[in-house]
Amino acid sequence: MTYLAVVLNGPKAKNGRKVFDSFLEQNRQMFWNRELTSACESITYMGFMRPGTLFVSGPASQLTVLKDAWARRILKPAMGYTITSLGDLGAIQQVEQMHFVPLGDVICDAVAQLNRQGLAATEQAIRQYVARHCPHVAPPGIEMVRQTITSLLSTGFVYKMADHYFVSVPTNSPMRPPAKAATKTTKTTVECQTGASMMCPQQTSTSSDEHVIEPAKKDHKKCQNSNRRSIFARLFSRGMKPQTIMPSASPIHVGGPPTPPPAAMLPTKNKYPTYHHDLNEECQRKARRRNHPRRGETQKLLSSSSECLKYYPVDMPETRPTRRRARMASPLRSSTPNNSDSAYSISPPHTDSNEEAGSISDSEINHTYININKFRRQNFDSTQFEDLTGATATTSEEPEILGRHIRGVLISNL
């Protein structure tokens, strides 16, 4: 077994094993180069010498693959490092690198890196990536990149979707995440719900001394029995009470003709309904009250302007003070009740039609009234009073009647 020394340039590493694992991980990503990936699986870690010399060993054929990859400038260093030299450990002879670089491997690596970063892997993007991240490779032209991609498409290493290119990842590639093992579906039983399997697991034994129980096992069994009496076991072990189905009040008969319900179950209908005499007026009054809003209530519309808003304190009083509307008193009028022989007047009589309503008459003038219809031979239901102060006789009978039966009522202005 021969040894190979890889001289790395980068930050000072304290653990050479991590540097070796990073070196293998970077080269395993080139899964399209099967010889290099198989060589990474075969080599072993031998040691590390500071500041950055890595020693590996393996079969001679696999180490030769690493030398060829370094010679063709496709061998990748560990993350954060660069490979300055590579050679055998015996004489540490340096391997000369060729000027020819396989463009297929470089383009495959560029497409894989663009896919991993979530960038569009177009022809122009691939060319820019090679020119920026591969200084040892002369920037290829767009036609050379297109020809190389066409050859990769024919071999199946790269596939195209619209104008974007993607690397065909095999199933055993380290870039593909490992598939999760299918979880076995468990069947929910009564023991899972009641917790009996957790409290008292069943123990099966095939040994011949099955009935022999040691003292330690007895203590373990007592502990299990005490756990079974815990509150969770008592809660879950309660059985469900059987639900009693109440018989229906009206049993359903299937197959028979539908029978009409008995007359006693039907509600009685009043053929001659009666209502109170003022029902119509009451309904109209309620409808009028519903349609016409109350006096003083105005419909307030919302406005988007802040000038029209009125802000009240947070603690509003239960009832806001309201002012009653001042009403003007209606003028009094004189009237005489029916079936009355006496004169009745709330306000003084008005003889002059030019006077205004509600004006006060002279308090010095006294008026005398007498019922004329009482002394006439005609039968009247109402009374008629005349003022004797300024009355003139219109008939021949009235002066005699007034002279003999003058029974007046003197009413003075109050």
Swiss-Prot record:
Name the Gene Ontology biological process terms. Answer: anterior/posterior pattern specification; asymmetric neuroblast division; asymmetric protein localization involved in cell fate determination; cell fate determination; dopaminergic neuron differentiation; neuron apoptotic process; neuron migration; positive regulation of transcription by RNA polymerase II
What ranges does the record give for the region Bi-partite nuclear localization signal, renumbered to this chain?
A: 285-295
Is-annotated flag, keyword Nucleus?
Answer: yes
Keyword tags: Cytoplasm, Nucleus
Query: What GO molecular function terms would the record report?
Result: DNA-binding transcription activator activity, RNA polymerase II-specific
Give the UniProt subcellular location, in the record's own words.
Cytoplasm, Cell cortex; Nucleus; Cytoplasm
Q: Which GO terms describe its cellular component?
A: cell cortex; cytoplasm; nucleus
In this chain, the stretch annotated as Disordered covers 282-362
Region of interest (Essential for association with cell cortex), residue spans: 1-31
**By its UniProt entry, which InterPro entries does this protein fall under?**
Storkhead-box_winged-helix (IPR019391), STOX1/2 (IPR040126)
Q: Where is the Winged helix Storkhead-box1 domain?
A: 93-170
**Nuclear localization signal: annotated segments:** 321-327
Regions of compositional bias (Polar residues) in chain numbering: 332-351
Chief location of this protein?
A: cytoplasm
Q: What is the role of this chain?
A: Probable transcription factor. Required for asymmetric cell division in neuroblasts, perhaps acting by regulating spindle positioning and myosin polarization, and thus the position of the cleavage plane. Required to produce daughter cell size asymmetry in neuroblasts undergoing asymmetric cell division, usually giving rise to one precursor cell and one apoptotic cell. Positively modulates expression of the serine/threonine kinase pig-1/MELK during asymmetric division of the Q.a neuroblast.
Q: Which PANTHER family match?
A: FI21431P1, WINGED HELIX DOMAIN-CONTAINING PROTEIN
Q: What is this protein called?
A: Stork-head box protein ham-1
Lineage of producing organism:
Eukaryota, Metazoa, Ecdysozoa, Nematoda, Chromadorea
